[in-house]
Amino acid sequence: MRKLAGFFAALAALALAFRFGGGAQDVSELVPVQALVIDAQNGEITVTADTQDVGRGGSLDAALSDLRAGCAGTLFTQTAEHVVLTQKAWFLMPQVCVSAQLRPAAKLYRAVGQEITAERALSFLQAHPGELTLSRARAALLENKEVQAAVLVKTGGGFRLGG
């Protein structure tokens, strides 16, 4: 009787493991994101990753979900170190700061001027990171303080950070 109970317990554990994603996953399918650029135009939110993947939607969460769904592998937005909001998308900053799909320790930037791609901005931002994180921006919002994100400006040969 004990052996039979043990067999059914093992069978149930195996079934649960496969039911809830306990199966093996190929590591080459994992796509960690390091930088995201968020833009808004004509009521549509566009999120572009440094991996060249793009997501679109009517809300920030919908665009981030579309970004993950459109990727050939398993895309992780929670690994993003840098989040850049364009001038047109700055109104999304409070949503970005509280999004469960983004890493609270990610640095926050506001882009002005020309179009900025996540892929091109990544190497600059890694060498010259800003100081404001999403969690600090959220704290400032909760205290009714103005959020002062570093301003990312595209120059003729690269980028520049301003205050």
Q: What positions do the PLM features span?
A:
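Membrane-proximal alpha-helical signals and transmembrane carboxylates
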Residues: M1-G163
